[in-house]
Regions:
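Extended catalytic-interface subdomain
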Residues: 1-5
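Contiguous mid-protein beta-loop-alpha structural module that forms a pocket-lining wall or clamp
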Residues: 10, 80, 108
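Conserved metal-phosphate-binding beta-hairpin within the catalytic cores
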Residues: 83-117
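Bulky hydrophobic/aromatic packing residues
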Residues: 107, 117, 129, 153-154
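Peripheral (often C-terminal) accessory segments that flank ATP-dependent C-N-forming ligase machineries
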Residues: 132-194
Length: 194
């Protein structure tokens, strides 16, 4: 597997909580967004409605419903096993779809298992709390990207809602947390920044 194949293909994660009685509850699924260097820049909640449609930042690639179902089955098995072994609390199971040598999409249904709160879990909660569209995204957006567009990104703007301050200890930050609730804005970000 070449990491190059993985850069433009989605990685996704399931946010699951395991209980004390080995039963796990699916909190949600997200598509992770990364820049050209592979650095995490945000997450988009996805569900069955996303299957069969192109995923953001992945032109020509659609997540097949069979792949999505396999991901959910395998993640459920991992989280149920963790509960049986005594773990209870947040757990994230990441999967990866990558291109094989012939360009066909291949699935690695268990990429990582994280027994902690993850950026995807945080993103999922921000999108639930402030998203109004059917496809909000939470991003660690560069301040320059916002300022170059003259966007009014504030804690009260329903389409571009800041979830972190622009300054910390009287110093400007380079990136801010942002719930982006306009698909055109998200497409703009993906085409110019990622």
């Amino acid at each position: 597997l070449s990491s190059h194949w993985c850069l433009s293909i989605p990685k996704s994660g399931r946010r699951i909580e395991t209980g004390r009685l080995a039963e796990s509850e699916l909190i949600g699924t997200t598509q992770l967004l990364v820049d050209q260097s592979g650095q995490y820049v945000g997450s988009i909640p996805i569900d069955y409605a996303a299957t069969g449609k192109p995923l953001f930042g992945c032109p020509g690639f659609c997540l097949a419903s069979e792949m999505f179902e396999q991901i959910l089955r395998d993640a459920r098995q991992v989280t149920d096993d963790a509960g049986i072994l005594g773990y209870h609390g947040p757990i994230s199971v990441d999967s990866m779809v990558y291109r094989g040598p012939d360009g066909e999409p291949l699935l690695r249904s268990i990429q990582d298992v994280n027994a902690r709160l993850t950026m995807g879990r945080i993103a999922l909660e921000w999108c639930r709390r402030f998203g109004t569209s059917n496809r909000p995204a939470w991003l660690l957006a560069p301040i320059k990207w916002l300022d170059d567009r003259g966007w009014d990104a504030t804690p009260d703007n329903p389409l571009r809602r800041l979830t972190s301050p622009r300054t910390v200890a009287q110093r400007d930050v380079k990136r801010v947390g942002l719930v982006l609730d306009d698909p055109a804005d998200l497409q703009d970000l993906l085409s110019t920044y990622l």
